[in-house]
Each structure stands twice: as C-alpha cells, then as structure tokens.
Amino acid sequence: MASNPDFLWCKEERKQESFFKVLKRSDMSSEDTRAIPYDFVINFSDNELSGDMKFRVQWGNSWKVKISKNPRFYFMEKSGWEKFVIDNALGDHEFLTFTHKGQMSFTVKIFNKDGKEMMQPPQSRASFASSSRVKTEQDVKREEEVLVSSDSRSRGPTTAAETNRGGSYKRKLNFGKKKAEETQTYKRTERTQNSKRTERVVSKERVYAGEPSSSVAGFKIFISKSYIKSLAIPKPFGNYMPKEKTRVKIHHPDGEKTWKVVFVVKERGQIFSGGWKRLCKEYPVVFGDTCKFTLITPLELLLVVSKP
C-alpha cells in the first residue's frame, strides 16, 4: 500500500518539539511572555539550555536570543527577544509557533490575528519612524517658506522686479507641494502592494485540489445546523491528519482559549466529534458562521470564525 507523503510529513513533524505564544502589545516583553514552557524545557539538557536559541522565519531572516533562568523557569533574555519582536513589528495579537529543528534552532511561523501566515517581512517600525521624520522636516521647511512669503506681502508695495521674483517663488513652492503630494501617494500605493504580498494563506480551492503546501494547510467551511454537533472534515485536508482516532487542540486567535477535540476516522471520512459541541458553545460558533482552520502543528489548529 502506497504511503501518503502529506501524512508522513506530519508524522515526522510530530517528533519535533514545539511551543506557541500569542503576543499582545501590553505585555509582549514581560518575563512571563518570554518564558519557555516547562513541558518543552524538560526535553533538553542544562547544557543545551545554557546557550542561545536561533529563530528563523519563513523569509529566511534569523535572530539569536540568549536563554536565562530564574528560580521558577527558563526564559528568553529581553534584549534578543525585543529585537526579534521589533524587527517583525509584532504586538497585535499575533500567534507564533516555535518548532525545534535541532541544536536549539527553531523555525518560527507567524500568524496574524485574522489567521493569515506572514510570508514576507512587514514594513518595520524603524522605516515608519524614518518616513515620519522626513515628512516632518519637509513640512517644517514648507511652513518656513510660507512664512517668508507672508512676511514679504506684509511689507507693503513692491517693485516690478520683486513682484516677478515673488511669482517665480510661488510657482516653485506650488511645484514642490505637488511633488511632495505625488511622492506620498506613491508611497501609500507601494505600502498597500507590499502589505498584500506580505500575507499569504492556502485557499480553500488549493486545499480541495489536493495540492500539498510546504508552509501551511487549512480549509474553510460553512456551518450548517448539523455541523454544531460534529464537523465533517474535507477529504483533501484529511491527508494532513493522522489515519487513526486521536485528540487535537484547537486555539482561539486571542491565545487565551483552547479546546481539545476528538478527531475520528470513519469509512465515509473524518470528523471532529467529542469536544466539538462544547467548542461551538464557548467560542461561540453558530449556524451561518464560516470557520477557517489553519494547521499550525501536526495536532494543533487555529480557528478563526467569520460572522455573516
């Protein structure tokens, strides 16, 4: 019997230790946020935990973060952690998964609060600050020019030569203003295009076509009345799941709620059964909603619900 490559990939991924974090602006640099989960730490020796963690994101950039320890837990040192957070403009309830690849190197996947995975670096806060500073200097210069023009008018009658110079100066000022407006419009358009390129998610059609994804798998489904008790899983997505009954963890995008749901394999397909009804009540999920599931680890999914 031929083996399923997607299932083998998930099976191999399951052997790798991983943990997740949800970053909120209010406490994204606190020691608790930087803590490394105990269930993860116990798989490593003290020697391994005395060095650095290396983070690598989907677009190839990497960061080194030192590990420290207090009487209660291991945690990531603030300097390296904050550089990673600032460089990626994090802090808006992003969902991060850290998968160990050996020798304290980690693949980090970043999901925005709408469930989309970041595939390219966002425009950094530093560049925002830089553009704001340039804009401010231009505005100040423009204001100074306007003040000079107003002052010249307040001095009373002028000669013909002065009038000509004033007209030339006014045309120059208007041209500069028009040029600045065109530049700002171009920058806004460029930022919008970059933002669209930054985020990518595997669409429902791609998963249904059975095309394997090297980055993220997921599906969308409309909730009918019967789907409140148990949820049928699209067959192509089932290729990423185990071939036997197991328990999976489903996360709310706020990072504070999780549910354990039984994944059942039947002759007619796979379903979410035990625990699903409770999830629908607590999330909540109701008839008419659209659920988007994103596979973040082999046995963990992120659920984002859209209301009609």
Curated annotation (Swiss-Prot):
Segments for region (Disordered): 117-198
UniProt superkingdom: Eukaryota
Basic and acidic residues bias (residue ranges): 134-145, 178-198
Swiss-Prot/TrEMBL keywords: DNA-binding, Nucleus, Repeat, Transcription, Transcription regulation
Signal peptide limits: none
Record bears the keyword Cell cycle: no
Major site of localization recorded for this protein: nucleus
Location of the protein in the cell: Nucleus
GO CC field: nucleus
Pfam families cross-referenced by the UniProt entry: B3
Biased amino acid composition, Polar residues: 121-133, 149-166
Gene3D superfamilies: DNA-binding pseudobarrel domain
GO molecular function: DNA binding
DNA-binding span(s): 19-114, 216-308
Comp. bias regions, Basic residues: 168-177
PANTHER family, alphabetized: B3 DOMAIN-CONTAINING, B3 DOMAIN-CONTAINING PROTEIN REM23
Name of the protein this chain belongs to: B3 domain-containing protein REM23
Biological source species: Arabidopsis thaliana
Source lineage: Eukaryota, Viridiplantae, Streptophyta, Embryophyta, Tracheophyta
Gene name, Swiss-Prot/TrEMBL: REM23
